[in-house]
Structure formats: C-alpha cells, structure tokens
C-alpha cells in the first residue's frame, strides 16, 4: 500500500466534520427564520444574515478543498469572521424584536458549541501546519 493510499483512507469527508455540520445547522436555522420576517427586514438584515451564516460552512468547505495549508487557514479564518458577523446580526435581530426568546435560545445552543468547535478546528490546522 502506498503512502498516498494510506492518506486517502484516513481523510475525513467534509460532511462528516462536526464543525461543518454545525455551520450548516446554524445557516438553516437562519434561512427558516427569514420567511417569518416582513419584507423590509428581509431586504436589510435578512440578506446580510443569510450571507454571513451561509459563509461559515461555505468557507470551511472552500478551505478544506484547498491544497496549501496557508490557503486552508485563510478560509477557516474567514469562516470565523462570518461566525462573528452572524452573531452580531442575531444580537441586532433580538434587540429589534425580530427573534423571540425560544428561537434565540435555540440559536444560542448552536452558537455555544460551534464557536469552540471552530476555534479548535483552526487551532488544529495551526498545529498541523504551523501559524
């Protein structure tokens, strides 16, 4: 068995990564909330929060598909920025009474797990490939 074959066998699929799944879960939650908002909110906050929440998992996917470690880390860090942007939009939506208590608690449960998972994912990339 060649070393290439060994590496291929241990490569984890993108869709099996917990951090990717959590990013997808958060963006689906945002997407499902969007339809309940008035058109004004959809055209302002709605578009922004959909883009930022979708970018979390999309940037993980793009980084995962990149060849060089530097490229991977760049996109994983973009994902972290999109995560923070999404949290900001959620806080703003909460303050403007666009998200009710129960739904915000559901968002918070995912955020509380996704944040540390994303940090650990980025840190593991740094350990494996250097800063």
What feature does the model see in each segment?
Residues 1-131:
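Amphipathic alpha-helical assembly/interaction segments
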